């Protein structure tokens, strides 16, 4: 199966079988949750890149994206070029920390800063193993690249605009956190969710046995339609810190091909740090 997705092609998905046949034509990024997982086993040729490299504290928000110049340096030092680049994660075999979001975080970070040919390995390392893919403990030699980062400002929405438009009739604000957190059981200074946010837990879109593997498209469409996420609406993806939302941003923008999708990167964490902002508890958006 060829790389698939309905967006502009910046992000697509691939199967293990496709990767096996195209190993010589792609770069590969391993973003397993801990370096020890990569040391234990990785796909041959994969360079390790941790998702935590891309965010830092800013103002009262503890996890915002680092400046363009810093990202450019990371990409260059990791040898990343604007060529077909496969991203995958595993289950955290050594430390047990993995939740599957590592690969959507890194894929989004690549896209956000100008990479134009990102291939997400659907099912991650687990599917690679299931398909009989080769594993190694040998590290590739990394050569510095000349990557030029360009921030894609149309991928995200910042707080002032978010607050101004979030209740517009043509806007649908999604909250990708688990239902119990959305309803009020999270660790934030205020409980619940942003008023008007509709809960679409990111994990509901994934295979229950492998959270890096998308459910069949018909099941995904049934879920997104059930919350009113139709292509004619402006979709804003949010969660706790902007991490879970990357899964839904990639899915809506490049898997389903929706025309107007952005992430509120500050998400519930930034929202709750502003004293006057209200929150809602329980299962209803308002």
From Swiss-Prot:
Catalysed reactions listed for this entry: thiosulfate + hydrogen cyanide = thiocyanate + sulfite + 2 H(+)
Q: What superkingdom does the record give? A: Archaea
- What is the designated name of this protein? Putative thiosulfate sulfurtransferase
Enumerate the GO terms in the molecular function aspect. thiosulfate-cyanide sulfurtransferase activity
- Description of its domains: Contains two rhodanese domains with different primary structures but with near identical secondary structure conformations suggesting a common evolutionary origin. Only the C-terminal rhodanese domain contains the catalytic cysteine residue.
Q: Keywords assigned by UniProt?
A: Repeat, Transferase
Q: Which residues form the Rhodanese domain?
A: 22-137, 167-280
């Amino acid at each position: 199966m060829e790389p698939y997705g309905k967006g502009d092609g910046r992000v697509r998905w691939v199967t293990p079988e496709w990767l096996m046949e195209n190993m010589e034509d792609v770069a590969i990024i391993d973003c397993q949750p801990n370096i020890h997982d990569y040391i234990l086993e990785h796909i041959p040729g994969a360079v390790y890149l941790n998702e935590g490299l891309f965010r830092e504290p800013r103002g009262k928000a503890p996890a915002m994206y680092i400046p363009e110049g810093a990202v450019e340096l990371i990409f260059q030092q990791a040898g990343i070029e604007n060529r077909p680049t496969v991203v995958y994660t595993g289950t955290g075999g050594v430390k047990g920390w993995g939740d599957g979001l590592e690969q959507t975080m890194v894929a989004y970070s690549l896209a956000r800063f100008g990479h134009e040919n990102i291939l997400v390995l659907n099912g991650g390392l687990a599917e690679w193993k299931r398909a009989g893919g080769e594993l190694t403990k040998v590290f590739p030699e990394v050569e510095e690249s000349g990557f030029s980062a360009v921030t894609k400002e149309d991928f995200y929405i910042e707080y002032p605009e978010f607050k101004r438009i979030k209740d517009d009739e043509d806007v649908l604000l999604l909250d990708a956190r688990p239902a119990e957190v959305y309803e009020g059981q999270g660790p934030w200074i205020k409980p619940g969710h942003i008023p008007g946010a509709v809960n679409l837990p990111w994990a509901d879109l994934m295979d229950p046995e492998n959270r890096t593997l998308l459910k069949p498209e018909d099941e995904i469409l049934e879920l997104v339609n059930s919350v009113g996420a139709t292509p004619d609406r402006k979709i804003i993806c949010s969660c706790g810190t902007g991490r879970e939302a990357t899964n839904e941003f990639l899915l809506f923008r490049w898997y389903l091909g929706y025309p107007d999708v952005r992430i509120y990167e500050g998400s519930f964490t930034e929202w709750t740090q502003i004293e006057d902002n209200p929150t809602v508890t329980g299962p209803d958006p308002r």
